[in-house]
Amino acid sequence: MEDDATPAEVVEIMGRTGMTGEATTVKVRVLSGKDQGRIIARNVLGPVKVGDVLMLRETAREARKLSIR
C-alpha cells in the first residue's frame, strides 16, 4: 500500500482550516516522482511542523479551504 506513496517535505504552515480547526493547511515540496520539485498545498490532520516528510497517495490535487457545507 505504501509503495504508491510519494514523499513530500513540509515547507510552510499556512494555517488551520475546517469547522473546528481540526486540519492544518501546509505547503509541501514533492521529493520524488513525476511531480518532483513541485510545491502544492495540502490539508493535514494531526501534529505537523516544517521539515516533516509526508507520504502522499497522490500529488495532483491541491487543497482548498474546508468549510461548513
UniProtKB/Swiss-Prot annotation:
PROSITE patterns: RIBOSOMAL_S28E (PS00961). Gene3D superfamilies: Nucleic acid-binding proteins. One of its GO terms (biological process) is ribosomal small subunit assembly. GO terms for molecular function: structural constituent of ribosome. Keywords: Ribonucleoprotein, Ribosomal protein. InterPro entries: NA-bd_OB-fold, Ribosomal_eS28, Ribosomal_eS28_CS. It holds the Pfam family Ribosomal_S28e. One of its GO terms (cellular component) is cytosolic small ribosomal subunit. SUPFAM superfamilies: Nucleic acid-binding proteins. Belongs to the eukaryotic ribosomal protein eS28 family. PANTHER family: 40S RIBOSOMAL PROTEIN S28, SMALL RIBOSOMAL SUBUNIT PROTEIN ES28. This is Small ribosomal subunit protein eS28. It comes from Picrophilus torridus (strain ATCC 700027 / DSM 9790 / JCM 10055 / NBRC 100828 / KAW 2/3). The lineage of its organism: Archaea, Methanobacteriati, Thermoplasmatota, Thermoplasmata, Thermoplasmatales.
